[in-house]
Amino acid sequence: MKLLVVTILAGLAVCHGATKEEIVATEYLQNINKELAKHTNVETEVSWAYASNITDENERLRNEISAENAKFLKEVAKDIQKFNWRTYGSADVRRQFKSLSKTGYSALPAEDYAELLEVLSAMESNFAKVRVCDYKNSAKCDLSLDPEIEEIITKSRDPEELKYYWTQFYDKAGTPTRSNFEKYVELNTKSAKLNNFTDGAEVWLDEYEDATFEDQLEAIFEDIKPLYDQVHGYVRYRLNKFYGDEVVSKTGPLPMHLLGNMWAQQWSSIADIVSPFPEKPLVDVSDEMVAQGYTPLKMFQMGDDFFQSMGLKKLPQEFWDKSILEKPDDGRDLVCHASAWDFYLTDDVRIKQCTRVTQDQFFTVHHEMGHIQYFLQYQHQPFVYRTGANPGFHEAVGDVLSLSVSTPKHLERVGLLKNYVSDNEARINQLFLTALDKIVFLPFAFTMDKYRWALFRGQADKSEWNCAFWKLREEYSGIEPPVVRTEKDFDAPAKYHVSADVEYLRYLVSFIIQFQFYKSACITAGEYVPNQTEYPLDNCDIYGSKEAGKLFENMLSLGASKPWPDALEAFNGERTMTGKAIAEYFEPLRVWLEAVAVESLCHQRYKNVDL
């Protein structure tokens, strides 16, 4: 590679015009994109090996290859400084060079880079290896987050049992990482400055190519917050009725251990005790899936069928040969958190997921397969463009399908929902169930990165890092931990993405724009006609719509070759992200909640208001 770079750069000496230099630069890009794909493929392979089997040897190999790639990226950064790329006439060439100029953590000195890899590995390994003792059998101490603890948090209605598992998990998943996390923040900041950014927050926000993006999100969140407050208030009202005043206050934040999720990020698991019309059966096809003999493999085959029905790409054989679709039973430690992987070769795409046969996991399968479809659609692009238009786009694609898959119409289509009676009460129940996932998630997602931005920006004193985290959670989500937390604890890294250095804003963006995508796809498919009750947005199924599939193809095939507003425009003609489609989708629920809040004196805000 070095000889190739030198040869190409030598051509600059004989190029006397900008046009000739740009031709040479274009040739350089063609070659360096191929080299980057090769290097990244090797690094991804060892990362896959480590995430699939956490051993000291796999960690050593991953860190070794990552360090080698960091050196390579530094060489690339030096090479591109020799090109006057900012003056070139081709917007595409300038965009590729700009992308290459961002070296990320590779900008760190070798010793710092090695230390960063060590602390990140330590945090990720700590998270993956958490085991707790059984609440009812202290001699049994092999319960892992996925699936044992998550199933208990989802299904138990015993406040003391839930408090026990919450405390045990947070004490082990978060608190031990504090010193490593402090070093991580330090090195993250150093890397940002070496890349000519002020801090790590600016690095993450730069991916969205808009200096006002943070302000835009704040504005959208404020527009959506009244609906969140309504949902929050109603859930608290119902939980208070179920558990009583001693467990759930009528006026304070919600105890997060009662919300059916370890991080209180989505609350659909407690729908059985908070649904507006409990006499109406909730849409949950988990038991039916088991009765029909569903397997993880069948769930993925059905996801593949959905994409193909829209005229999109079929999963390649490599996917089926190399993916991990169930938790291995050989006792190994692995990262069970569902993830999709691109290996930067033709058709080498994989998913690693400890899949269980449940409705929720069925939707997760479609989410992860959205990433895979994106990988396949842009794999013809140069390496630097083989990513989403922005990080949120990548997360949104599969969620659009999940919105469709979760409708009664689609579940009836595939034979999983039987004897379903559709009326207004059933519709409100279904919308409320969706809100417990989609609306509840928004403030959670925002705080995951607002917290880390504050640390990167130095806005929170190190001696108050844990308190700062819980202040944000209460301010934005109106929740609180089940036990008092102090600076002896450190709880943010108890979320996988925080321990693993994964930017979380992508999920907030995804949960906003997926409704824009969904609305446009539904209109195109003839499944949604605004202001016509026969074709409501919340029961739209885009399965089989080649026309909707073409919208996805138009956008996904661009990869990151265009700014995200261009990609959005290719899908639906819009260039801005808004919360209007969310409001449209949930309007019937908003009207119902507004009425019931008055009738039952169910307040919306979680502070200083009485029922």
From Swiss-Prot:
Gene3D superfamilies: 1.10.1370.30. Its main location: secreted. Binds 1 zinc ion per subunit. Disulfide bonds join C133-C141, C336-C354, C522-C540. Its EC number is 3.4.15.1. One of its GO terms (cellular component) is extracellular space. It comes from the Eukaryota. Expressed in the compound ganglion and in the posterior region of the midgut. This is Angiotensin-converting enzyme.
